[in-house]
Each structure stands twice: as structure tokens, then as C-alpha cells.
Amino acid sequence: DVDLTPSWKRITMADAVQNVTGADFMAIEGDDDAAVELAKSVGVDMEGVARKWGNALYETFDQKVEETLIQPTFITMYPVEVSPLAKRSPEDPHLTERYEMFVCGCEMGNAFSELNDPIDQHQRFKAQAEKRANGDEEADMMDEDFVLALEYGMPPTGGLGFGIDRCAMMLCGTDSIRDVILFPTMKPLDSDKKVSKEVSAPAEAAQAAPVVEEKIDFSNVQIEPLFQNQVDF
């Protein structure tokens, strides 16, 4: 049974990984090659993953730890490499002020302090763009307008994105998000017909009769002030 009674357990990602796998990533913090080898040593598939300390830590958590978080748990201190919009932790520059909530082995929410340093943000966007160029479809793209806005200034801020649909899945005991999502994306049954209609639409439009613009007669329209019954004009 899942106990949602406060307060929920709080643990850093690195400590959660060490508790489950025995791998101590903090002992080799910042050493990219050693982190990748440590992840592989506990059975983590690192194929296609950037050879960075933070990516190795996150992949180990994602593949080995997340499914074990049955009781409500806050995972804190996410690596910079997987948190492109989150502010760095003042306690450790390799980590960020970010946490995620997990229940029944599923992420229920993501929250962090917003990064408001334009120089740091630009560097992270560049790193994300390189990941995207190498095939990472989840990586962010460069956003020069956002960086420019940060240069003008943004006060300290933060936010939480909560997975309402996932919470509904847990409370309803369903196995698929499609059972609870309000507006599921569905393939139209007449998708083939729709394509054929779209192809023939230009030809049909060319043959259609010209549209006659109907003129509206405003000659009898009377414009009156608002509240004329309450105000002496």
C-alpha cells in the first residue's frame, strides 16, 4: 500500500543511487570518464548518452532507482547536465536546485529554481543544441530571445509542474494514461480520406464559383453611450 501521509521522504539523487546500486558518484564528482565506467559497472546502458558525470548519474537513477520509489519520495539535487533551465546549487556547482516527486515508481512532478543568469543559460543552451544535433530529441534548442530577456533581468523565481493525469492513474488504479487523460490524442478513423481531400482541395477551390461579398447596411444603427439610464449626459 502507498502511504501519502506527510511528510514525504527527501533524498538526493546521488544518495538514492548509492542506496540502491552501491555506486558512489559523489566520490568521483566531475570525472566524466570514471562516472561512465561506474554506471556501466552496475549494468546501466550508456549507449547514445553523453559522456558526462551528470548524465551518467541520471541514467543510473533512471534505469536502476526510479522504479523502486514506491512510497512518496522527493528526489533532490539534479545534475546540471539534465537540468538546462534550473539554477545551480550554491552548495555544489555540479548540481541544481531541482527536485522531482515520485510515487509508485512514477514521476508526479518536476520543480526547480529558475536559472536567471544569461551567461550560464547561453552556455547550457549551446550544450543542449549539441546534444540535439547528436540525436537527442529531448534536448532543448538555442533560444536567443530568452537569453536576451534574461540580460534585461529576471527576479528570483521558481515553479512546479504537477502531473495531474499520472496522479489520477494512481488514484484510479489504471495502467494506461489513456484511461484517465481528458483529451487523448487519437488517430482519425478517416485519416486516409482526409489526406485525399486535402490533395484535391486546391483543384476544387479553383473551380468553385466566386464569392460575392455581402455589404452590411449601417445607416439605421444608433450609437448610444453606456449606462445612459444611470448617468445624466
Where are these predicted regions, by residue range?
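Metal-assisted phosphate- and nucleotidyl-transfer catalytic regions
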Residues: 1-108, 127-154, 193-203
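Short, well-ordered loop/turn and helix-capping segments at boundaries between secondary-structure elements
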Residues: 22, 104, 114, 118, ...
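Flexible loop/turn segments at secondary-structure boundaries
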Residues: 81-85, 108-110, 115-119, 168-169, ...
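Conserved, well-ordered active-site substructure
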Residues: 88-97, 169-187
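Conserved phosphate/anionic-ligand binding catalytic regions in large, soluble enzymes, centered on
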Residues: 104-114, 154-172
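Acidic, carboxylate-rich catalytic segments that either coordinate divalent cations
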Residues: 151, 164, 174-199
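Acidic, proline-/serine-/threonine-rich low-complexity intrinsically disordered repeat tracts
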Residues: 197-219
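Long, low-complexity, intrinsically disordered segments
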Residues: 211, 216-233
